[in-house]
């Protein structure tokens, strides 16, 4: 199995001071200290650590060759909860995008590095078939502000910045890895890949956690989601959701996946864990109305290869997620995607996994 993983990695605190007034007041304060404020209580708690996650998605489980969306890898760092202060308020300029509530919790998810690779079905042709999707790579970094309200709804705003084209190193990762590590030939048509182009993707998404039933420590819930993404990489609107069965369901909103795909999230609140060993099985899907996909439509500012994309695309997914205390999380999922362009031969399927650990 041909897995290519991109790794990398890195947290803060608050303080307060209260002026003394009169000698008598100071003596009373020593005799009967004032109740601790929420800020004092937070400062006295052990600092929660951030988490590093590695995601790998690959089609090798379902075929003996690469085709279409053949490889995705991403390293991300989820911060501890942001406390009151400039970092907490830095995203308030987004205003109504983030609902206001007294119990909101914010975290920042730094997308350290990500890469996606796309190829036609027949890797031996050079130039490749004009009716098959073009060779392309996407290399990016970015971040997402995640805010939870009421313990059961999550809002995210993500910015991804990078490059599409030879500078994304798709050719080197696919061909050099295959020949040096696995010993099989790579794609012969990379000279025809999309040209270099700055790549931007802005995404706004919502998740809701709807409990259905819980019995004997095992629960069932439904997590619907809606997502709008815009940019020269992707422009689409999506709705979907997953059903989960297991324990500690209120610690997260489902496993994350690389866009475009059923958009889970890195968000987790381990303080809600109900057992040392957490697990759940999940199944669901997502439907997308697609206005732009650079990997099918071709370059925005230059002539390049392209195919006629389909405006509606759907994904079905199923898998399992596991965690041990607050230290390690792992999930594995399988995904099947409907045809993305006219003339495509067969649907695509791939496997994805995530490994997360505290730093």
Predicted regions and their residues:
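Outer membrane beta-barrel transmembrane domains
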Residues: 121-124, 242, 247-359
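Transmembrane beta-barrel strands of outer-membrane/channel proteins
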Residues: 52-58, 109-117, 159-165, 206, ...
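Long, hydrophobic/aromatic-enriched structural stretches that serve as scaffold segments
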Residues: 93-171
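Residues on the lipid-exposed face of transmembrane beta-strands in outer-membrane beta-barrel proteins
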Residues: 73-79, 113, 141-147, 161-163, ...
């Amino acid at each position: 199995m041909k897995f290519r993983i991109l790794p990398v990695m890195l947290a803060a605190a608050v303080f307060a001071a209260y002026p003394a007034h009169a000698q008598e007041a100071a003596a009373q304060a020593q005799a009967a200290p004032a109740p601790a404020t929420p800020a004092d209580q937070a400062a006295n708690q052990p600092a929660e650590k951030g988490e590093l996650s590695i995601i790998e998605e690959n089609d090798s489980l379902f075929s003996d060759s690469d085709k279409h969306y053949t490889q995705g890898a991403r390293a991300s760092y989820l911060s501890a909860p942001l406390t009151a202060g400039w970092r907490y308020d830095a995203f308030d300029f987004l205003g109504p995008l983030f609902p206001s509530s007294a119990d909101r919790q914010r975290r920042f998810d730094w997308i350290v590095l990500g890469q996606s690779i796309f190829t036609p079905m027949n890797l031996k042709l050079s130039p490749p078939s004009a009716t098959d999707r073009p060779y392309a790579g996407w290399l990016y970094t970015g971040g997402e502000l995640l805010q939870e309200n009421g313990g059961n709804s999550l809002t995210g705003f993500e910015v991804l910045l990078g490059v599409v084209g030879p500078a994304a190193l798709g050719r080197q990762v696919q061909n050099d890895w295959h020949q040096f590590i696995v010993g099989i030939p790579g794609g012969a048509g990379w000279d025809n890949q999309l040209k270099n182009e700055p790549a931007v993707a802005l995404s706004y998404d919502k998740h809701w956690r709807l409990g259905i039933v819980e019995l004997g420590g095992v629960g069932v819930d439904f997590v619907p989601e809606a997502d709008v993404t815009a940019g020269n990489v992707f422009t689409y609107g999506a709705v979907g959701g997953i059903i989960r069965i297991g324990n500690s369901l209120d610690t997260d909103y489902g496993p994350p996946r690389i866009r475009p795909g059923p958009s889970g999230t890195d968000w987790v609140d381990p303080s809600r864990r109900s057992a040392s060993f957490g697990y759940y099985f999940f199944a669901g899907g997502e439907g997308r109305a697609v206005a732009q996909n650079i990997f099918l439509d071709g370059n925005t500012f230059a002539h390049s290869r392209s195919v006629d994309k389909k405006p509606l695309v759907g994904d079905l997914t199923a898998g399992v997620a596991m965690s041990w205390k607050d230290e390690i999380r792992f999930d594995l999922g399988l995904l099947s995607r409907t045809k993305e362009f006219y003339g495509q031969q067969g649907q695509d399927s791939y496997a994805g996994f995530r490994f997360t650990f505290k730093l």
